């Protein structure tokens, strides 16, 4: 989360499943919807989730007790159907996902880099 705040990134893209074929592929780095979790000096709130067929969209709020206090909204786009060691069977799903990411990035005033 330090890198996210340092680079002032507001959009995160995740293209892996958490578990595939019974194997952990990614450690969940965010709390469940409506909950907060501390990551070192940062507190992350998972404020909202919207689940779609191929992806999940989340809105996080990251804060840090500092002088001045830090608070930032982060948009997390999680593509859930990209197979390990393969490519998605439906290119339309990938294109829709990319469109959503681009629209989100364009809608932000100073979005910083997209973190993938």
Swiss-Prot record:
GO BP, sorted A to Z: cell differentiation; intracellular signal transduction; mitotic cell cycle
Domain of life: Eukaryota
Any one of the GO CC terms: cytoplasm
Pfam families cross-referenced by the UniProt entry: Y_phosphatase
Reactions the enzyme catalyzes: O-phospho-L-tyrosyl-[protein] + H2O = L-tyrosyl-[protein] + phosphate
Listed Gene3D superfamilies: Protein tyrosine phosphatase superfamily
Residues the record lists as binding substrate: 84
EC code: 3.1.3.48
UniProt keyword terms in alphabetical order: Hydrolase, Protein phosphatase
Cysteines joined through disulfide linkages: none
InterPro entries: Non-rcpt_Tyr_Phosphatase (IPR052123), Prot-tyrosine_phosphatase-like (IPR029021), PTP_cat (IPR000242)
Enzyme class: hydrolase
Domain Tyrosine-protein phosphatase: 1-116
Molecular function as annotated in GO: non-membrane spanning protein tyrosine phosphatase activity; phosphotyrosine residue binding
Stated name of the protein: Tyrosine-protein phosphatase 14
Gene designation per UniProt: STY-14
